[in-house]
């Protein structure tokens, strides 16, 4: 990455605290940001990209309503409903309600939207929000540990018309690297009735595991055929078998990059779910973090250094918190052009501060 690139890192004490209340990822945000802080990645230093830590704003009701239904928002933003089971809105089982949910939703959505705003206002070339990346939330329903559709909101924000003497509509590519299919994002932008040969402002590409009985069940998670009535060339999936490794990603990556070059996005959103990494409790893939060809670090570095446009890195899945912390700290180090030995660092902190 060129040294002149600017990196915006979106976080606050309140955001990390509330994100650490997630039933599926308790204390994860605090552990992630403790490690990044301990590595000194927030500190300015010669020879690295400029990084600015930015306190996120809370998303307004209007922000959230660009995608979510009024019924869902009225319920989930009411503090009296925190911790209450409600199957109508998916608040049960793997998306159980919790105390603090009514604050979590606007804080996480606001953080991701703040990241988008730094990119749109040319304040940054790369924006990072590890508490974002919630790709299973539907318009009126929580699902799969996700309660707010910040990924969808980010796409809608970035694709807005850019005013000026020659107004233009930015092109936004969403690349999902989570173990699980980006069902809610893909379904939100899936347009099978698109006229043949027409273009789109958005392109969704999800690389994931898909098999019978594996969450989420979606007809869009498999390979599609152009003869399929539901085919949309701008909503793509690459399903991988159990055991996918660096070699697997290395083989498919030229396809991913060909898609990116052809689409030529102004903005690329990368959902960096860490549950596809070896060591995650799902134990489905055998993907590594390091810099070798096909590894997660290698893929992200390729995006940051050779893909067109600006980039937004979001979090996502990952249920071994130290594993996730190492992954996202390492990806942060790539964004700011710092070489760091994560394998030598212990993970003992459970709190952090910005100094």
Region annotations inferred by a language model:
Residues 1-66:
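N-terminal low-complexity, Ser/Thr- and acidic-residue-enriched intrinsically disordered segments
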Residues 2-5, 9-10, 16, 75-355:
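A general "terminal functional-core" signal
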Residues 56-84:
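Charged, often glycine-rich, active-site loop that binds/positions anionic groups
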């Amino acid at each position: 990455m060129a040294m002149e690139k600017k990196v915006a890192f979106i976080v606050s004490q309140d955001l990390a605290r509330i994100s650490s209340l997630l039933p599926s990822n308790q204390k994860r945000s605090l552990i992630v940001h403790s490690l990044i802080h301990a590595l000194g990645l927030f500190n300015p230093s010669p020879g690295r990209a400029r990084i600015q830590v930015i306190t996120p704003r809370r998303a307004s009701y209007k922000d959230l309503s660009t995608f979510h239904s009024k019924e869902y928002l009225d319920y989930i933003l009411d503090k009296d409903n925190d911790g209450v089971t409600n199957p109508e809105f998916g608040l049960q089982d793997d998306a159980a309600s919790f105390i603090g949910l009514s604050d979590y939703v606007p804080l996480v959505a606001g953080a991701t939207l703040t990241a988008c705003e730094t990119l749109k206002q040319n304040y940054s070339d790369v924006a990072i929000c590890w508490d974002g990346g919630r790709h299973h939330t539907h318009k009126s329903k929580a699902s799969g540990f996700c309660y707010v559709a910040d990924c969808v909101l980010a796409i809608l924000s970035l694709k807005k018309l850019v005013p000026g003497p020659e107004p233009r509509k930015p092109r936004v590519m969403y690349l999902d690297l989570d173990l699980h299919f980006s069902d809610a994002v893909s379904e939100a932008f899936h347009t099978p009735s698109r006229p043949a040969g027409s273009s789109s402002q958005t392109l969704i590409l999800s690389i994931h595991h898909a098999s019978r009985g594996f969450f989420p069940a979606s007809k869009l998670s498999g390979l599609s055929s152009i003869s399929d009535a539901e085919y949309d060339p701008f909503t793509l999936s690459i399903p991988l078998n159990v055991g996918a490794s660096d070699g697997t990603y290395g083989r498919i990556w030229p396809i991913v990059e060909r898609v990116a070059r052809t689409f030529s996005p102004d903005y690329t959103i990368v959902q960096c779910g860490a549950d596809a990494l070896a060591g995650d409790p799902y134990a489905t893939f055998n993907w590594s973090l390091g810099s070798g060809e096909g590894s997660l670090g290698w893929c992200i570095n390729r995006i940051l250094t050779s893909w067109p446009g600006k980039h937004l890195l979001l979090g996502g899945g990952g249920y071994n918190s130290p594993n996730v912390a190492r992954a996202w700290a390492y990806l942060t180090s790539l964004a700011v052009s710092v070489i760091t030995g994560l394998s030598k660092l212990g993970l003992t902190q459970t709190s952090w501060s910005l100094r």
